[in-house]
Structure formats: structure tokens, C-alpha cells
Amino acid sequence: MARTVNCVYLNKEADGLDFQLYPGDLGKRIFDNISKEAWGLWQKKQTMLINEKKLNMMNVDDRKFLEEQMTSFLFEGKDVEIEGFVPEKDQD
């Protein structure tokens, strides 16, 4: 049986992550409160952010910026702003 969590991003019970994907206390918080579905949504946003802003994951400041964006997205309900991006459903 799949592990379920009360996902704070989706605001519902959903399948939880299989294991902790992020280190430290934030990783534990994500594991306990974020579903696979919500994590997948974050991964898409994360990829877009890394590409559009040309982030270097070897750079401490870039990693800190990405972590702040992740926390805002997953726990505060703030969408990631990517300059020039228009979601498909809004396009003509």
C-alpha cells in the first residue's frame, strides 16, 4: 500500500514520496507534507528556473535562491515567476 500524506500544496490526501529527496530539516518537512504529484509540479518549475535564469547548482547563492523558490512554491502557495513563460492553457 502506498504511503499517503496530507499534502499542504494540493490541500488533500495524496500519495507521498517514497523516500526523502532533499537533505536536512527541509527535506524531512517535504517528505512529511508534500505528495509525489506536488513534487513533480515543483520539478517542472525548478527545471524552468534553472534554465531561464541560467542557475549553476555549484554556486551557493544559486542553490539558496532555488531553495527559497521551492519553499515558497510548496509551502506558501506562491507561483514561480518565469519571465516570458505563458502556460499552454492561456495561449491562443
Swiss-Prot record:
GO cellular component, as recorded: cytosol
Please name the SUPFAM superfamilies in this protein's record: YggX-like
Q: Which Pfam families match?
A: Iron_traffic
One Gene Ontology term of the molecular function aspect: iron ion binding
Name one process (GO BP) from the record. Answer: cellular response to oxidative stress
Instruction: Give the top-rank taxon of the lineage listed in the UniProt record for this protein.
Output: Bacteria
Q: Does the keyword Iron apply?
A: yes
Keywords assigned by UniProt?
Answer: Iron
Q: What does this protein do?
A: Could be a mediator in iron transactions between iron acquisition and iron-requiring processes, such as synthesis and/or repair of Fe-S clusters in biosynthetic enzymes.
The family note in this entry says:
Belongs to the Fe(2+)-trafficking protein family.
Name of the molecule in the record:
Probable Fe(2+)-trafficking protein
State the organism of origin.
Answer: Shewanella sp. (strain W3-18-1)
Its lineage opens with:
Bacteria, Pseudomonadati, Pseudomonadota, Gammaproteobacteria, Alteromonadales
